[in-house]
Amino acid sequence: MDLSAAAALCLWLLSACRPRDGLEAAAVLRAAGAGPVRSPGGGGGGGGGGRTLAQAAGAAAVPAAAVPRARAARRAAGSGFRNGSVVPHHFMMSLYRSLAGRAPAGAAAVSASGHGRADTITGFTDQATQDESAAETGQSFLFDVSSLNDADEVVGAELRVLRRGSPESGPGSWTSPPLLLLSTCPGAARAPRLLYSRAAEPLVGQRWEAFDVADAMRRHRREPRPPRAFCLLLRAVAGPVPSPLALRRLGFGWPGGGGSAAEERAVLVVSSRTQRKESLFREIRAQARALGAALASEPLPDPGTGTASPRAVIGGRRRRRTALAGTRTAQGSGGGAGRGHGRRGRSRCSRKPLHVDFKELGWDDWIIAPLDYEAYHCEGLCDFPLRSHLEPTNHAIIQTLLNSMAPDAAPASCCVPARLSPISILYIDAANNVVYKQYEDMVVEACGCR
């Protein structure tokens, strides 16, 4: 099977399979690029220690060499996150620490206007290129917002542009402060619309100038065929008879509103609220599709390099899964002992630890934070009489009673999560935007019998 065929097969699997199978198909797709698959702990068995999501789902991490050149891994200083093509904007990192309740004491306050009703916050980095001739007329900002879901409600949008202090921007430099004018960009079929006008206050040091552009973003999305790019133009005027003023005289820089560093470029922060329940599997599938497109553009691997074929990878994973299932069956059955003996060796339904390590899953090239968390899981017997704290349903009570009287007549009720809570994740989406999103039902808070 050639590489493009393997990619097509895996993308079909991702569109049709269950989440567990989807995780495995994503791992196969990633492994199809190069290098043999290795298990999370470096060994081949399901050894001791606490269970992790990688072990529970049967997912395997792959070496960085298995990822196409466009997503070659590099480890950021002081962070476990790795991605060679995207540098997370410092504002999005600060936003995550603030909204996730992880801001350290004394950390700078983060503007949260419009974020209260949002469950998703996306940071779009400026993609415009500037030249010196544009410095006299203004500065344009260009954002590709095509990744926003049409069904999502935009509850807030803010343009943030870095401004540095300069001799001409300090106190006493002007008899009256210059005006900053923010408008939409002129186009072939539309005239520019003034969005914002305010005084450029004297500045010592540096700060991020923030402009509310929520109404402009909503109008952009209401267009019959909205363009992919959302374009804004910042200008300055000064004097009794307002005349154009070069923005760099007020401390604005180039390219992208601050400097050559990615974290200094202007950023459009869009807060939205989804109309559907978000599934982490949807983002995993999008990541795999984007990776599949990159894999299809890569040259075919040299057969002499020891690269594992997709067929060999699938076969190897199937053998490992079968061996693991056999081990669990032997452990759960007590090596062929009767049903009653196995039951006596198990505890009642309760919450047990389940540590999720995204690095172990190989997801640290798109998940920025957190890199691990405690998810918990439910395990144990639901036998008669059921305890009230397990919050059994009436159906579970009847089923458990029947099972206690005649085990062959009805199976025991199941120990499952009864209450779950969300976590917030900061990640890079398939369009290379940094996204803060709250995912429901990620942590087990209580278990019950159902």
Curated annotation (Swiss-Prot):
CDD domains: TGF_beta_GDF5_6_7. GO terms for molecular function: cytokine activity; growth factor activity; identical protein binding. The keyword Plastid does not apply. SMART domains: TGFB. Gene3D superfamilies: 2.60.120.970, Cystine-knot cytokines. Pfam families: TGF_beta (PF00019), TGFb_propeptide (PF00688). InterPro entries: Cystine-knot_cytokine, TGF-b_C, TGF-b_propeptide, TGF-beta-rel, TGFb_CS. Residues 20-321 form a propeptide. It is found in: Secreted. It comes from the Eukaryota. Belongs to the TGF-beta family. Homodimer; disulfide-linked. This is Growth/differentiation factor 7.
